[in-house]
């Protein structure tokens, strides 16, 4: 499974219904599980973004489908990145051409 990091920003709608955010997060986790996606961590944050989700999915299509569904509800905007652990990154670097 591949690891992904999604940054979350509340929309105006999401802010107007901020008290429902924990309930929406629980529903999101349940939907992700049904889709075969494992939510590793979910955080609300201070700073440039309002939250972050770390999850594992079988491929980019599954990850994209999950975050598109989340964004389509209108409460958040998302930015998703593929994340690599130290072992994965070492393998990538070992295969890159040296200049």
Where are these regions (language model features)?
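A compositional/biophysical signature of low hydrophobicity enriched in polar/charged and small residues
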Residues: 1-99
């Amino acid at each position: 499974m591949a690891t992904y990091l999604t940054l979350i920003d509340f929309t105006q709608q999401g802010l107007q219904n901020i008290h429902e955010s924990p309930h929406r997060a629980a529903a999101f986790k349940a939907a992700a599980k049904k889709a075969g996606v494992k939510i590793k961590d979910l955080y609300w944050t201070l700073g440039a973004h309002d939250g972050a989700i770390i999850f594992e999915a079988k491929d980019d299509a599954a990850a994209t489908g999950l975050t598109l569904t989340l964004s389509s509800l209108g409460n958040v905007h998302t930015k998703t990145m593929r994340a690599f652990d130290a072992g994965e990154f070492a393998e990538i670097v070992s295969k890159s051409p040296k200049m």
